[in-house]
């Protein structure tokens, strides 16, 4: 095989590789942007009226054990998104991650609930879901 044919084959293979990776990279950029925006919202006091942010209770950007204002310890949010939907005893029903986020916004931050499909909720859920990357999905009531 000549050098020219080898070069043409190498270029063709590179073009094919780019054709397969470009859509994945294009999809990754908006996801990374949503995760970043969610992290910003998580740290901002703009979701409520009490001057608090999500990090008031969920310390370390949700990556470490937190504490409620009453002193009750709460677990880190690492892997938490992978546990939804789940049954909530206090609510007496199955809740989604979006419902839990809105409960925290309304009760903890004194804010107005977000639209479950609005851009702020999508960003917050994207951020919280990123904290579950690589964690096993925990489906209540299912035994392995």
Residue locations for each model-derived region?
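Classic N-terminal secretory signal peptides
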Residues: 15-17
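Bacterial N-terminal signal peptides that target proteins for export
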Residues: 2-12
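Electron-transfer interface patches adjacent to heme c in soluble/periplasmic c-type cytochromes
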Residues: 26-33, 44-144
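Sec/Tat signal peptide C-region and signal peptidase I cleavage site
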Residues: 20-26
């Amino acid at each position: 095989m000549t050098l020219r044919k080898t070069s043409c084959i190498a270029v063709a293979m590179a073009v094919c590789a780019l054709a397969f990776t470009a859509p994945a990279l294009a999809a990754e950029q908006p996801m990374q942007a949503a995760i970043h925006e969610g992290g910003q919202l998580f740290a901002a006091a703009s979701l409520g009226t009490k001057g608090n942010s999500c990090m008031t209770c969920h310390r370390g950007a949700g990556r470490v054990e937190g504490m409620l204002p009453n002193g009750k310890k709460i677990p880190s949010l690492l892997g938490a998104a992978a546990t939804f939907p789940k049954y909530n005893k206090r609510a007496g029903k199955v809740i989604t991650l979006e419902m839990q986020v809105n409960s925290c916004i309304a009760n903890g931050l004194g804010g107005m609930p977000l639209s479950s499909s609005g851009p702020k909720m999508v960003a917050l859920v994207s951020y919280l879901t990123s904290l579950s990357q690589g964690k096993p999905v925990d489906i209540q009531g299912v035994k392995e």
